[in-house]
Amino acid sequence: MAKLILLRHFKSQWNLENRFTGWVDVSLMKVDFEIPTLDFDIVYTSPLIRNLHTVLEVFEKKDKYPIFRHFKGKMKNWAHFEELNQNYIPVFVSEALNERHYGKLQGLNKEETMKKYGKKKVHLWRRSYNLVPPGGESLADVVKRATPFYKKYIEKDLRSGKNVLIVASHNSARAIIKYVEKVSDRDIINVEMPFGGLLQYEFNKGIYKLLKNF
């Protein structure tokens, strides 16, 4: 039996300004609320700085430190952690857990975007499952890249009995919720997760049970 903890990153400056952020690397605002102490053995997140910063904020409550690891490229090849003691927790970083790419909408204020493209069109881009903004991704695209990664790596760790923390963005979190809770394509567009929102599941023999919703 293991636990899955799903945490959405804390609020960034662009979130405050109501901008489409997507893959733009924007840092967090000052975290001014109490972060719960979480029990986990391994962490997965994206390379976006707002997610990495959230991971570091969570580790402020831990007596171990994070070691960031990568799945490909020079960062993977150069990594040698064999000589480290056991006082650390691995944090695996992958673009598969990135936020939805909003294409030409990235950086635009949402009110300005509605004036430029029309309120109805922007609403459909944001709240449909398959529609794609110019140069961007749909929620379905996020599901297609996040779910195979989740099944290959994260669920494997859960099956081995490890407690896993995922620090995700809104749409990568929704992709995981869709898989874990078996949410339909139609219903997932109505699922919301606030900044700093946290879900905790029990994983036992391939079955997920929601324990806590913070």
What are these model-predicted stretches?
Residues 10, 45-48, 96, 127, ...:
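Short, well-ordered beta-to-alpha junction loops that form the rim of enzyme active sites
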Residues 13, 50-52, 99-100, 172-174:
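Short, active-site-adjacent cap segments at secondary-structure transitions
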